[in-house]
């Protein structure tokens, strides 16, 4: 995957133009372009899918945010079919997990620590499986469309008191993808355990989310906050990268000038 500039997170037209540029320059069918699932990113995702650009939707934190980009993906595919174009355009929707618990643990009693991210994931998986079973999607699949896969992101455990394979065990779910840090991968290979696969009906997600709300966490507002903070963090990293490249260029230019003088 290669991301559009995070400076475009609130710029629909700019995101579309950047996605087209990356796709054209990359010239690889397996190159996914990252577009954040912000309100401004959603229409850009639909348009990019319509244009045949594989998209990795980033910065999703809630079921509602996931459903918005799932809808955008299907609209893009439907438009391709109406235009007589190939409906096979790849996409993944990346739901960030561990940041929920980092943000909420301090507000919750011990028995609810590290429960919010998993519950949101269960709730979102239920919506994902309902989408796959819907007549609307079945019609698209029959025409040759590929499902937009739900991807579990940020699955490294941040809480030192929790299992280092917590989110890997919890997110064993058919038809999904789990991206994990190398350290977490090795930990699971060494001592990880599975206790079955995720329930398609959401399991105990609704009950857990109700308890967390009762404890004082505004889950809907927190989802918006996490997405905004995630976008801001991406911008900070982007500037750091550009500053590093500029500094390296200055160093190389200095060495080149020195070589000429000698």
Provide a role label for each language-model segment:
Residues 1-44:
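Active-site beta->alpha loop and helix N-cap motifs at the rims of alpha/beta catalytic domains
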